[in-house]
A protein has these predicted regions:
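Structural signal for conserved beta-strand scaffold positions within catalytic alpha/beta enzyme cores
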Residues: 35, 61-64, 125, 145, ...
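Class I SAM-dependent methyltransferase SAM-binding "motif I" and its flanking Rossmann-like core
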Residues: 104-167, 217
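Class I S-adenosyl-L-methionine
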Residues: 1-16, 21-122, 210, 215-216, ...
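Short beta->alpha linker loops
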Residues: 44, 100-101, 127-130, 156, ...
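Residue-level detector of structured alpha->beta connecting loops
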Residues: 31, 93, 140, 168-169
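Short beta->alpha connector loops
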Residues: 13-16, 39-40, 156-159, 177-179
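Short gly/pro/ser/thr-enriched loop/turn and capping motifs at secondary-structure boundaries
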Residues: 40-42, 68, 130-133, 180, ...
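A contiguous loop/helix-start segment that scaffolds small-molecule binding in enzyme catalytic cores
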Residues: 6, 95, 165-229
Length: 229
């Protein structure tokens, strides 16, 4: 019996021209598109895709996850999304679940895929350009100056940054806005402030490049990536 397939599609960081050919072809072939939506209705990944793919006639599912620490609420939202996706897959409709950057890096797809597979459906990842690679290009920086140089990807929480700051090599702090003031303080304390740079909304029309954290305003985009050397 035929079944639909769930594709976790990496949309890249923001520039539609950074969508891979495979990502474009996969999205074109899927009648259903699931895309993250913020609380104020913005769908960044979908807007990126619209710059490269004609979505006319496709069903669009907004994916909403509240920024809550309530475990039960998060589990309920997760289960609701799985049910909605499975309903389409069971009707033999392939679904492209859009993920900013790459679907293996802090992505909704990797949290959803095991439950979809457990229900007997395929879930396949379509790689995308990771945001931190585009950030490195925007900064004109080498993330690994030596072949033996370590590279660390760190979520933007206070405790995560404090733990990682002493590690050797380059640290990439994703979603750096989550605790920016605390991160700045930690970097000053550890003597790493002058070696840190930040890019907001990389690849989007609103992109901002900050060579010094002194220039970064307290309020800014959630999509901020910091590079600490």
């Amino acid at each position: 019996m035929s079944k639909g397939v769930l594709y976790g599609v990496g949309t890249g960081p923001g520039d539609p021209e950074l969508l891979t050919i495979k990502a474009v072809r996969t999205i074109e072939s899927c009648p259903v598109i699931a895309a993250p939506q913020t609380a104020d209705g913005v769908m960044v990944a979908l807007d990126i895709v619209r710059g490269a793919v004609d979505l006319t006639g496709k069903t669009v599912i907004p994916v909403r996850f509240s920024m809550t620490r309530d475990v039960e609420r998060r589990a309920a939202e997760h289960a609701s999304l799985v049910r909605e996706l499975v309903a389409h897959l069971d009707a033999v409709r392939d679904v492209a679940l859009l993920n900013l950057g790459d679907p293996s890096i802090y992505a909704t797809f990797q949290r959803i895929a095991p439950d979809v597979r457990a229900r007997g459906f395929e879930a396949r990842a379509i790689p995308g350009v990771p945001s931190f690679c585009a950030v490195a290009a925007a900064l004109e920086r080498d993330l690994t100056p030596e072949m033996s140089s370590p590279l660390h990807i760190v979520p933007g929480g206070y405790d995560d940054v404090r733990r990682a700051i002493g590690w050797p090599g380059t640290k990439v702090v994703m979603k750096a806005r989550r605790s920016l003031a605390d991160t700045k303080r930690i970097l000053r304390e550890e003597g790493a402030f002058d070696g840190a740079e930040l890019v907001e909304d990389c690849g989007l029309p609103s992109e901002r490049v900050y060579r010094s954290l002194d220039d970064v305003p307290d309020r800014g985009s959630y999509f901020s990536t910091m590079v600490v050397r």
